Design a protein with these regions (language model features):
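Structural alpha/beta core scaffold segments of enzyme domains
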Residues: 1-114
Length: 114
C-alpha cells in the first residue's frame, strides 16, 4: 500500500499498524530453548559439546526448520576442536505469532549462551 501511494503521489508514504494489526501481519523471532552440555579434559580443553535445541515457530511458520538448521551451522563450526559433537534441533508449531526470517537469520541465538 505504501509503495503504491508513493508511486502515485511522488511523495513518501508511511503505514502505521495498531497493536492488533502488528501481530496479525508481522512475524517475530523464533523463541528457543537450548540446553548445552560441555565436556573438557583436566587441562580445560573442550572435547565434547552437546546441544539440544527446541524452536517454537508459532502457527504456520514455514521458517522454523531452516532457522533450526542455521543455528547449528552457526554454532558448531566455532567448536571445531571438540572430538565429540551432538546437535538435536526440534521445531514445534504452537498457537503463537508465527516466527519468520529477520536480520541475522538464525545467528542471534548462538551468542546468547556462548
Amino acid at each position: 500500500l505504501a509503495a503504491f501511494v508513493t508511486v502515485k503521489t511522488g511523495r513518501p508514504a508511511l503505514v502505521i499498524l495498531d497493536r492488533k494489526e502488528n501481530f496479525a501481519a508481522t512475524t517475530t523471532r523464533h523463541a528457543m530453548e537450548m540446553r548445552v552440555s560441555l565436556g573438557a579434559d583436566r587441562d580445560g580443553t573442550l572435547r565434547a559439546i552437546k546441544i539440544e535445541n527446541m524452536s517454537n515457530t508459532g502457527a504456520y511458520g514455514e521458517e522454523g526448520p531452516p532457522v533450526t538448521m542455521v543455528v547449528a551451522n552457526n554454532i558448531l563450526p566455532s567448536y571445531n576442536r571438540a572430538r565429540a559433537i551432538y546437535y538435536n534441533g526440534r521445531t514445534i508449531y504452537t498457537n503463537m505469532v508465527a516466527g519468520g526470517a529477520l536480520r541475522g537469520y538464525g545467528a542471534s541465538w548462538q551468542t546468547s549462551w556462548a
